[in-house]
Amino acid sequence: MILAIDSSVGTAVAVTDATGVERAAGSSADRRSHAESIGPLIAHALAEANITAADVTAVVMGVGPGPFTGLRVGMAAAEAFAWGREIPVWAVRSHDTLCVDIDSDTLVVSDARRGEWACTRYTPHPEGGPALVSSETFLMPRAELAPDTTERDGARVVFVEEVSPAVLATVAVSRQARGETLLDPRPLYLRQPDVTMPQ
């Protein structure tokens, strides 16, 4: 079984089978309570799937793009769970969940706050399934892209409202089956935090 976690928007957890089929899921839309939500959501998903931590063979985590604090919470929980069980942790870009089996170029857009969008462009994979990333995630001024935009520069525009952790698992499993290399487990922060530790 696979445990999948994403905290790039709200906080979302799912348990899937080895192929990425969802068995249980839970989420919180509150973008300010990641730390309070993550533990109970994991416990609920395991219980709903009628399994224990010992039944989990891999963890998939969304690595953003997302805000500094939210991403840290979800990724830390995923890595801690995997470390405790001595199982692999797989990293997937959160935007990838909006681009499974697309048939045209697609621009995935999420709210980066401070008057900006976070954007990632994708192109369809010739074999179907998870799309290929054709641009690294970049920031765009909100003034350049209205919230009701459906097409830009030849690409369909999709705005992120939520991220499905079960689809994260599907993407990870599919990419590994195709022999593709997954991302390094590093967060794709929208920007660095306002407050940093002194050197």
Feature map (PLM): residue ranges:
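Phosphate/pyrophosphate-binding loops at sites that engage ATP/ADP/AMP, CoA/4′-phosphopantetheine
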Residues: I42-A58
